[in-house]
Each structure stands twice: as C-alpha cells, then as structure tokens.
C-alpha cells in the first residue's frame, strides 16, 4: 500500500491510496473499505473528537493486467466541534481491506500505519452570508458558505423556527432537494453536487453544517455565486 496524495480543506481531508493485493487476489469491485483508526491534532493543539469516513474506488491511471490494483479515495471529516484540518497532524492506521463498510467480508488482511501533516494553506474561500433562508416554510439563517476544490459547505443557525423541525427535510432527502447546492462560475458554467460528504446538525448550539462533493473539482477563485436553499448568494 502507498499513500499517493493527501489534500485538505477546512472541514475535511482526502487521502489517495494506491493498493496492490497479493498474487491470486483480484480487486474488481466498485467498493472497498479499510478497518481504520484515525487521530488528528490541529495546528492549535485541538484533538479531533469523533470522525466520519468515506470511501470511493477511482479509475486507475495505469494499466493493470493482473487485476490486483485499486486506487481508493478516503475522505475524513470531523463529526463534532470546530476542528480545522488545515495544518493538522494525522495518524492513520488501516487494518485489512474489506468488500463492505460493515467490515464483514475481508479481502486482504494486514495492517498499515502512517503519520502525516496536512498542508498549511487553506485552498478554499470562506464567505460570511448571514441571510435568512427557508426550508419547506421553516426559517433559518445561512451564516457562511465555504468553497474549496474538495467541497462546498453551507452553515446555518436557528432562525425564528425550531432548528430540529427546520432541518428534517435535509435528512429525508440527503440534502439533495432541500439544499440543492450549485455554483456558478465566472464564465457562466454551473456545477452541481455529486453527493453529500456529511450532514451535521448540532442542536445544542443551534447550528448545522452540510458539506457536498461537487461534480467537478473547483477553483474557488473562479466561483462567482452559490445557490443553496432556493436562493443565490454572490461570493465575489
């Protein structure tokens, strides 16, 4: 196993893994996952408390006649607190390659560990909005938008309606319809969301953070506006 590349933005990190199975093992599925342990400490000394993981098998950039090779993208995000991945130190331990996220079908046994420091420069743009929005008739406030090559993140806080009731539609449709994030580039092109990375609501703090992977890798400097929750907001 080899770590090919590690990139991060404020809210998540992406680890590109090049994996070659032992002779006799064919990696021909469209999904694999590792059992794992992740610890991270921000450059301010804050430890990541809880985290979520995503896995995606990517098309290989090289020919592999043996069928033993897989390129796997691992994404890591914090589930609690204000953890910032920029410049964070990460220790990653992977235990066995599995065919499923429940870790029931072991494909390749083994243990692999590494420690790395994420890039110090924030590749994204954080834009303060503080504008009212509606989610199926319920009021909230869109506080910030964050655009990076990795993701588009919307943060909201409670408005005049109870936050728990307000965000119910987000979880019923995975944010696809109730948030419907889309960016417009300076050349007029629009880019939609491929999938959500995480949907987190902190009811104690009356805030929510909803992060999406877009259909294309974005250059934040070329984004002119973001559409979300049925409204369009300039980020220039």
Show which residues each predicted segment covers.
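Alpha-helical, hydrophobic structural elements that either
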Residues: 1-236
């Amino acid at each position: 196993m080899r770590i090919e590349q590690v990139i991060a933005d404020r809210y998540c990190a992406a680890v590109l893994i090049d994996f070659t199975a032992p002779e006799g093992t064919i990696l021909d599925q469209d999904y694999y996952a590792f059992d794992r342990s992740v610890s991270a400490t921000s450059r301010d000394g804050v430890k990541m408390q809880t985290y979520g993981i995503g896995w995606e098998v990517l098309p290989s950039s090289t020919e592999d006649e043996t069928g033993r090779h897989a390129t796997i993208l691992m994404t890591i995000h914090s589930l609690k607190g204000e953890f910032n991945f920029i410049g964070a130190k990460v220790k990653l331990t992977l235990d066995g390659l599995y065919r499923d996220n429940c870790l029931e079908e072991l494909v390749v046994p083994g243990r692999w560990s590494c420690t790395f420091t994420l890039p110090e420069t924030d590749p994204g743009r954080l834009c303060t909005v503080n504008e009212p929005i509606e989610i199926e008739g319920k009021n909230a406030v869109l506080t910030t938008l964050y655009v990076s090559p990795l993701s588009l993140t919307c943060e909201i806080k409670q408005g005049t309606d109870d936050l728990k009731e307000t965000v119910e539609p987000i979880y019923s449709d995975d944010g696809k319809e109730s948030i419907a994030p889309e960016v417009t580039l300076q050349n007029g092109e629009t880019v939609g969301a491929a999938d959500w990375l995480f949907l987190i609501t902190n009811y104690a703090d009356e805030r929510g953070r909803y992060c999406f992977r877009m259909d294309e890798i974005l250059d934040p400097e070329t984004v002119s506006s973001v559409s979300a929750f049925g409204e369009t907001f300039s980020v220039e």
